[in-house]
Amino acid sequence: MFLINTLLLILPVLLAMAFLTLVERKILGYMQLRKGPNIVGPYGLLQPIADAIKLFTKEPLRPLTSSPLLFIIAPTLALTLALSMWLPIPMPYPLVNLNMGILFILATSSLAVYSILWSGWASNSKYALFGALRAVAQTISYEVTLAIILLCILLMNGSFTLSSLITTQEYMWILLPAWPLAMMWFISTLAETNRAPFDLTEGESELVSGFNVEYAGGPFALFFLAEYTNIILMNALTAILFLGSFHSHTNPEMFTVNFATKTLLLTMTFLWIRASYPRFRYDQLMHLLWKSFLPLTLALCMWHISMPIMLSSIPPQM
């Protein structure tokens, strides 16, 4: 039964990810005054399927000097970690109701750094290694602010379980009292998922394509799948943390529809930002984090710790 439940979670996520690639190309197309994919199937709806068939039927080429085992393990690990992060997400009931659900997601997203680092190192190419080191520095840096913002939310929530956030936000979204945190969280998730304007790992002008430059066919598709799965996951997490949907026990599917709509709108904002903004310079990226976000999030964290103590109260206990 658990296997069936797992498949029923993974398959819709993969399907959503496949069509996200189409939505992205359509949005970019319309923002650049062109149509986007419109040949394969009606309105280009079969384009993701055609892309998948093309990539997975290609010959998986590997550089002669690469490390064969790590070269294959890296993309597999990337996708496995991206999918495993969906386990504690409540929709409205999680597949695995972990006591430390948020901590699990944070730890698993940190492990994703290894797949990027291994892919860059195993490729035995200087461009891939530079791209991987950039990605690792960026991901590790922005995880600091993500962790502190999560701590602030948990202090308001009073529990580490994601399901309790639904109860906390029954009457008011956490977005309203904590909008500075929400803004910094959203920008940090952009950087965490290596999306524009923080896509420095894929700087075509200086790094050809980034850490996946030596990958082709199936292994490249796995990295692609992992990236887009992470984008949907981060937006799903944003929807749960800041835009909690109302959950009625008599009508739980309404929560799922509400949650999916919010996730879709946030994901489309990601794509809209990609179409609108140029890429940051690397020093600007690091300056934004270490000199702007980190002091602000630390100050807000101290504020959220001191407020309950000052008011002689404790956060709501589940």
Curated annotation (Swiss-Prot):
Pfam families the UniProt entry points to: NADHdh
A Gene Ontology biological process term: mitochondrial respiratory chain complex I assembly
Catalytic activity: a ubiquinone + NADH + 5 H(+)(in) = a ubiquinol + NAD(+) + 4 H(+)(out)
Residue intervals passing through the bilayer: 2-22, 69-89, 102-122, 146-166, 171-191, 222-242, 253-273, 294-314
Location (main, coarse): mitochondrion
Oligomeric form and interacting partners: Core subunit of respiratory chain NADH dehydrogenase (Complex I) which is composed of 45 different subunits.
Protein's recorded name: NADH-ubiquinone oxidoreductase chain 1
Organism: Oryctolagus cuniculus
Gene coding for it: MT-ND1
